[in-house]
Amino acid sequence: MSFLQTLLQSLRDNIAVLEHEVDLHNLGTPQVWDPEASTKFDDPEHLISWQAFEAIEKIRVDVRALDAAVTPNHIKLLEMGLQPARTSALNVAVSLGITDAITDLGGDAKLADLASQLNVNEQKLGRVMRTLAAEYIYQEKQPNVFSNARHSKNLEKEGSAAQFLSLLSNEGLRSSAGLLSHMTDIKTRDSYLATDAPFCSAVAQKGETFFEYISHPENSGVALKVIKGVLPWLNNLPKDIAQRAADGKVKCVVQDYFKDNAAEGDIWYLRGVLREYDDEDAIKILTKVANSMRKTPGSRMVINEIWNSSPFIVSNQNAAPSTLTPIHQSRLPDLANLMTWDTLFFFGGKERSVPELEFILEKAGLRISRFFQFRTITTMVECSLA
């Protein structure tokens, strides 16, 4: 069977699984045009089955393989080089509030009316709309008449998704332009410090870290994106949280990572800690945790992170790539890798692969005892004493 036929058969099999799960759990109808057809399917609060999630993963991988197989290389590479235009178009959409404007204009918006409402050039707006329509974000129902589609419904200007996407597609895109110099400059190429992140040279340009930059009043708009987009739960804190905290049983203990732990416990939880340090310092931190764990028999350490992952290891060139994805790593590995790049752009730090994690754990006298994957790109790794 040819490679294309192998991909086609894999897609048939996984689409059958997905449609069965969608029907079984009443998840709606996956499609691209109707914003309401896939409400449950898209709702992050509605946990889809593992079978559905795994089918989605496999379909995405094989669809991309099919696209790569049938696309001449000069077209494939040209399209990849032009990706920043798509990202910029997305930033225009969320920053101007195109989704809201289409709704305000009755759902089917003439391009001239849309440009007038947004106070932008009609011809340039048309190019933005068609760029995003090609990605199934909006739909052109008639010539120069645009409507929202399934993937644009979460782009309301004040929504947390739009704020987060604006951060990625504006400041994130600008930071990414500094990656090459970050990787080749003798001062920064081996550094994981926040002060050496691409953001500092490409955006801040004053040696300031990301958080120093957004602390200035003139950069409050970026800070707002972080609050509304990255930390949307801050908008929904209970009014009596201060009293609840005062009445709680949680005790905060000041801790220096590089000194003996000031507290004891059954569970040690690390999130965004190890990524801040190179291997030498990360091993020192883990060694301190391991020493504390020895004081409490059966204690564990849990690490919650996104890992640098391999979308597939090509051990068989005739197999569908969806069958070649390693198991113990982040799910949606292509997306996980993009997210680890974005954290490097903004904050520096060393995002690791699971084998790289195992290396520093072993040096500290620890090992992975359990590996928990979620239906997203983050994982929980439970570690115990070796």
Label each residue range with its predicted role:
Residues 147-216:
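Leucine-rich, amphipathic alpha-helical/linker segments
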Residues 63, 74, 161, 176, ...:
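Alpha-helix initiation and N-capping motif
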Residues 1-129, 140-142, 228-386:
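Alpha-helical subdomain
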Residues 51, 83-84, 117, 164-165, ...:
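Residue-level detector of alpha-helix boundaries and kinks
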Residues 133-145:
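A short, conserved structural fragment
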Residues 87, 205-234, 339:
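Class I SAM-dependent transferase core
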Residues 93, 135, 176:
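Extracellular structured ligand-interaction cores
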